[in-house]
Amino acid sequence: ASPGRGELRFAPGGDLLDARGIRWHVDGELSALDATVHGGESTLSTPTYPDALARLWSALTCPTSGEVLLSAAPGYEFVDWGGAAHVGGGSHGSLHASDSLAPLVLCGVDLPDDPPGQWAIRDVASLITKHFDQRAADL
């Protein structure tokens, strides 16, 4: 990651633990992602770019992602192929918290015994799938 604030190299499996419980090896400038380390250099925090390392790693290892990744600055977005723009709402191409975080309200869904420290779409999708699969089985 290198947004003009330094270079940061990272990979899964190091000593730093993120908010979702994933361990990372990082080398370089944490300021590239406005990241900080807490608790004796063991907990990685990236509030400006939630779940930054996992989201970037997922994109970098996607076979169809290409070789360059960009994240739009707050207030800007990359218009999709159909020409749709959503400035001020959910947009295309930003890892920033203003485009990544949203309220989550659940009703009638069984929560996991050990919920993640930071929720992601993949967690919600799993809950909803389990909920409706169970309801279909009960019919």
Task: Tell me what each language-model feature is.
Residues 127-135:
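C-terminal alpha-helix
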Residues 1-114, 119-125:
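Active-site neighborhoods of enzymes that stabilize oxyanions during catalysis
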Residues 1, 134-139:
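Polar, surface-exposed loop/tail segments
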